[in-house]
Amino acid sequence: MNILVVESQEKLAEAGYKLIENVVKSKGNPTLGMATGSSPLGIYAEIRKNKLDTSHVTTVNLDEYVNLPHEDKNSYHYFMKEQLFDHLPFKATYVPNGMANDLEEECNRYEGILAANPVDLQILGIGENGHIGFNEPGTPFHSRTHIVELTESTRQANRRFFEKEEDVPTHAITMGIGSIMKAKQILLVAMGPKKAEAVKELLQGEYSEACPATVLQRHPNVTVIADQEALSLCSEAIADEHRQVFTISDLLSDSRVGETAN
């Protein structure tokens, strides 16, 4: 696992963009796994600013709320259109359909999409309770795309995006942890003190379904971009053990970048 320590959101965005640019420019028809929420906003802004050629890129999104219309400003369909899809051309874009009449069938359909479009680089944030995607604590590490009931802590974390508390969805459709782990490369971004406990568990916690992010300890190609606040609870020894690269140039020249996961 590589750790890249940054001083600001701007530096995080620049570093994340460089990783994505490297994949997009080095592969013929890459697939990017996209995340939503506040964590990747700066990265998406960099993609827009640099007018990255994404005409050959396929995207697959991690998750979507259930029973939230696609045109709702808080849906992840809307988020992706606002951040990227209305600004740049893509070969194909996929977001789970939380409005599907048969949600179990939608989960199966989405797994088929993932099988047909293996992810070259998956972007992840990390929840305060260690969730990745909407995979809450206790989710089996072998899980595939599924419907999840959101925990109260996750709903409260997303409350700020909705006018009223009762408007916050109670369920979501999400790529499973097993689905996420199939990505060839994973980029996890974390900023601020609220993420410190989760990042500590990721780096030095026990490999356990009680903290979904700890599954990444077993992935062969993970890069964590974080600031000092997000790393503030980690022991220096643990941080140094994982801090194998120090600059984005070092990271891009590292022979493991782009390796296929087992």
Curated annotation (Swiss-Prot):
Q: Which CDD domains match?
A: GlcN6P_deaminase
Q: Give the matching Gene3D superfamilies.
A: 3.40.50.1360
* Coiled-coil zones: none
Please verify whether the record's keywords include Mitochondrion: no
Its EC number(s): 3.5.99.6
What top-level class of enzyme does the UniProt entry assign?
hydrolase
Q: Which reaction does it catalyse?
A: alpha-D-glucosamine 6-phosphate + H2O = beta-D-fructose 6-phosphate + NH4(+)
Active site feature: D63, N129, H131, E136
Record's keyword terms, sorted: Carbohydrate metabolism, Hydrolase
Which superkingdom?
Answer: Bacteria
- Single GO molecular function: glucosamine-6-phosphate deaminase activity
A Pfam family that the UniProt record links to this protein: Glucosamine_iso
* Alphabetical GO biological process terms: carbohydrate metabolic process; glucosamine catabolic process; N-acetylglucosamine catabolic process; N-acetylneuraminate catabolic process
* GO cellular component terms, semicolon-separated: cytoplasm
Give the record's pathway.
Answer: Amino-sugar metabolism; N-acetylneuraminate degradation; D-fructose 6-phosphate from N-acetylneuraminate: step 5/5
Q: Which NCBIfam families match?
A: nagB (TIGR00502), PRK00443.1-1 (NF001682)
Q: What function does the entry list?
A: Catalyzes the reversible isomerization-deamination of glucosamine 6-phosphate (GlcN6P) to form fructose 6-phosphate (Fru6P) and ammonium ion.
Q: Which family does it belong to?
A: Belongs to the glucosamine/galactosamine-6-phosphate isomerase family. NagB subfamily.
Write the protein's name: Glucosamine-6-phosphate deaminase
